[in-house]
Amino acid sequence: MYQITRITDKEGVAKAEGAYLAHQGCVGDAKMEDGCVLFHCRYDRRGKPCNRYIRTSIVQDWKKDKVTGQIVVETMNSVYYMDPVRTGT
């Protein structure tokens, strides 16, 4: 599971629009589907259960840090930073 910790534009400026702010802090599963990242949000940023999906625009590049496990996904419009979340299961 991963948590969306930050969403920026291509220049690194944090996105402050409502939809982007609502996505930050979500915890869930991420997978590639049709060239996009489909993020199944299982918990909102307050830790309350939710069951929604977030789909990015077309992915141009992504990198996974081998030490921290952080994934950085660069889309046509945004950069998503996702940190691994350890679960008790």
PLM regions and their residue ranges:
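Short, compact, well-ordered microdomains
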Residues: 56-89
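N-terminal non-globular leader segments, chiefly Sec-dependent signal peptides
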Residues: 1-67
